[in-house]
């Protein structure tokens, strides 16, 4: 089990050797976000900006004007706190900059709500030009980083990474596409990011305790969302659920709901943080209290599907 932030720390320097146009910026959190590893291998293309995310965003925009691809890293909650700079200097200016937000969701546990990225997807989804990636595993994060480094970016990206070690799902990655990782005919559960393992475990609990079969769909790209797979699942299964370690307001659930409203009205239940601020506690305790543990996800799906 490995964290998605580790993939960033280990693979960005590798890609930096291959692509000399990659630059990395740090906001004094390099050991936590893992961007510090880029300084060790490519010090001439690494810049320490200090505790100054707003300035870092402006600098990243300026550097990108000279043909460089900039990766800038901080905690997701700290980046989104600089919304005006992101909006004007990156989204409005449409700069090829990758905002890397780590330590997202309740999974950071005892660090508390001020450090948890719980509304980051909502905020980034609202920005024109911004694209959003949320890999579920170390291996998928490697593929996402390769995509970002080897693609000629035409807009800013938000890359959402977790602190907690998770099961290493080795899945094919295609930008803008979801992947069916377990097929079923009765229920579809869409998941994004590091909670995928809990969702997969929940699907097994459901199948072992009921007669229902569960389709689990991984959604690593949150914007643009894969409309085709959402409609296909709505047409072929009886009920849809979304699960995310994020607020249910504006996240994966809202993105799926938007697609269904326009293209195929269907019943959808959103599982996530229900418009509240959680406490500071061990991640497992928070997941249990707020309905994101495998058992709680299974209970909710069974209750709403059979009720």
What are the language-model segments listed below?
Residues 1-158, 165, ...:
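Thiamine diphosphate
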């Amino acid at each position: 089990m490995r964290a998605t932030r580790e993939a960033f720390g280990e693979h960005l320097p590798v890609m930096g050797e291959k692509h000399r146009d990659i630059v990395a910026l740090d906001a004094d959190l390099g050991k936590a976000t893992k961007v510090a590893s880029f300084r060790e291998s490519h010090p001439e293309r690494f810049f320490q900006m200090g505790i100054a995310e707003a300035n870092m965003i402006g600098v990243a925009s300026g550097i990108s004007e000279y043909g460089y691809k900039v990766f800038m890293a901080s905690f997701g909650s700290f980046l989104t706190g600089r919304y005006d700079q992101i909006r004007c200097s990156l989204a409005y200016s449409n700069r090829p900059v990758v905002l890397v937000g780590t330590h997202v969701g309740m999974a950071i546990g005892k660090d508390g709500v001020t450090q948890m990225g719980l509304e980051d997807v909502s905020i980034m989804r609202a920005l024109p030009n911004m694209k959003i990636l949320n890999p579920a595993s170390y291996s998928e994060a490697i593929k996402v980083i390769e995509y970002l480094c080897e693609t000629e970016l035409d807009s800013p990206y938000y890359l959402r990474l977790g602190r907690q070690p998770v099961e290493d799902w080795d899945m094919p990655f295609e930008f803008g596409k979801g992947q069916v990782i377990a097929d079923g005919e009765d229920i579809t559960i869409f998941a994004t990011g590091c909670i995928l393992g809990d969702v997969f475990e929940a699907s097994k609990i459901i199948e072992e305790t009921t007669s229902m079969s569960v389709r689990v769909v991984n959604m690593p790209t949150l914007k643009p969302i894969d409309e085709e797979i959402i409609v296909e699942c709505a047409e072929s299964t009886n009920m849809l659920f979304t699960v995310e370690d994020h607020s249910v307001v504006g996240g994966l659930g809202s993105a799926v709901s938007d697609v269904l409203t326009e293209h195929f009205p269907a019943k959808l239940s959103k599982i996530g943080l229900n418009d509240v601020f959680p406490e500071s506690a061990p991640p497992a305790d928070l997941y249990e209290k707020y309905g994101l543990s495998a058992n709680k996800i299974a209970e909710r799906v069974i209750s709403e599907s059979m009720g």
